[in-house]
UniProtKB/Swiss-Prot annotation:
PANTHER family associated with the record: CYANATE HYDRATASE
Enzyme class name: lyase
Pfam families reported in the protein's UniProt record: Cyanate_lyase (PF02560)
Chain's role: Catalyzes the reaction of cyanate with bicarbonate to produce ammonia and carbon dioxide.
SMART domains linked: Cyanate_lyase (SM01116)
Membrane-crossing segments per the record: none
Entry EC number(s): 4.2.1.104
BP GO terms, sorted: cyanate metabolic process
Entry's Gene Ontology molecular function annotations: cyanate hydratase activity; DNA binding
InterPro entries: Cyanase, Cyanate_lyase_C, Cyanate_lyase_C_sf, Lambda_DNA-bd_dom_sf
Name the UniProt record assigns to this protein: Cyanate hydratase
HAMAP family membership: Cyanate_hydrat
Keywords annotated in UniProt: Lyase
């Protein structure tokens, strides 16, 4: 998978400034995962957010236009090859239908929104090795009957 040029530029500027996505939360008032999605063009910024981000990264104002354009959703091959991303694919391959069944038992026939959605990543200390804790929260949308 090739990383878009704008993504490479944004990531390099962030690295050059010694910033993390968590550092940018205070500047933009958005979650670190949402900000990372901006970098990868999976989300778009408001004009004000784009100005703040470009300023924080020390980039030319010409990047504002790119950050406010409609995003391109979905990046990379259908079956991901990056090991970390592949684990999520594998998790859904193994647990996707079981998760679906449990959601339907609790909510009924419908889906979890990825639009009215938040995702948090936390680090949990564990004596056997640090753990990754991911919390997804999406609005339940029942299927309409007509």
């Amino acid at each position: 998978m090739s990383i878009p040029e704008i993504t490479q530029t944004l990531l390099q500027a962030k690295k050059d400034k010694g910033l993390s996505f968590a550092d940018l939360e205070a500047t933009l008032g958005r979650d670190e995962v949402c900000i990372a999605a901006l970098f990868y063009r999976q989300a778009s910024a408001s004009e004000e957010e784009a100005k703040l981000l470009v300023e924080a990264l020390g980039l030319d104002s010409s990047y504002i236009k790119h950050l406010t354009e409609y995003p391109v959703k979905g990046l990379g091959p259908v079956v991901p090859t990056d090991p970390l991303i592949y684990r999520f694919y594998e998790i859904m391959q193994v647990y996707g239908f079981p998760i679906k069944e449990v959601i339907q038992e609790k909510f009924g026939d419908g889906i979890m929104s990825a639009i009215d959605f938040t995702l948090d990543v936390e680090k949990e200390a564990d004596p056997k090795g640090d753990r990754v804790k991911i919390t997804m929260s999406g609005k339940f949308l029942p299927y309409k009957k007509w």
